[in-house]
């Protein structure tokens, strides 16, 4: 067996790194819970103007979830979600700054959350649809 030349070694090393770089993001994406993404819905508090809500959920490297809430109609964005859990298609989150909570169930194709939004003593049905 002939020893590898420096150029051959560099070529093999480059190919190995390219392959690893293409596989690792796919593996990370597979591990992310299906609720990770951007979700949008409309609160309809009967007799009051409708309020659009956008929820952003991301996964940390340790597997924990983080999120923020935007209220586009009020020009408010980035309200922190302080507690968020996802288990067996059930999502629960709470936002202390917004004084709200949401409990929803993810549908089978991972495109819609159907649930209940609670805020300020009011409970409203809220469907969140995946936008990203």
Name what the model sees in each region.
Residues 1-7:
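N-terminal secretory signal peptides that target proteins for export/translocation
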Residues 7-8, 14, 54, 121:
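Compositionally biased, intrinsically disordered low-complexity segments enriched
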Residues 10-22:
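Bacterial N-terminal signal peptides
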Residues 30-130:
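Central antiparallel beta-sheet cores of small beta-barrel/beta-sandwich binding domains
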Residues 21, 27-31:
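Boundary at the C-terminal end of the N-terminal hydrophobic targeting segment
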Residues 1, 22, 125-126:
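General helical secondary-structure elements
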């Amino acid at each position: 067996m002939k020893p590898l030349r420096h150029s051959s070694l560099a070529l093999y090393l480059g190919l190995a790194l390219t392959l690893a770089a293409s596989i690792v993001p796919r593996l990370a994406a597979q591990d992310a819970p299906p609720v990770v993404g951007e979700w949008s819905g409309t609160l309809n508090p009967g007799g009051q103007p409708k309020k659009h809500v956008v929820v952003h959920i991301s996964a940390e490297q340790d597997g924990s979830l983080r999120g923020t809430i935007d209220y586009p109609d009020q020009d408010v964005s980035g309200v922190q979600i302080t507690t968020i859990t996802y288990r067996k298609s059930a999502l629960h989150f709470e936002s202390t700054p917004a004084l709200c909570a949401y409990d929803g169930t993810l549908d089978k194709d991972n495109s819609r959350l159907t649930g209940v939004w609670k805020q300020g003593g009011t409970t409203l049905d809220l469907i969140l649809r995946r936008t990203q």
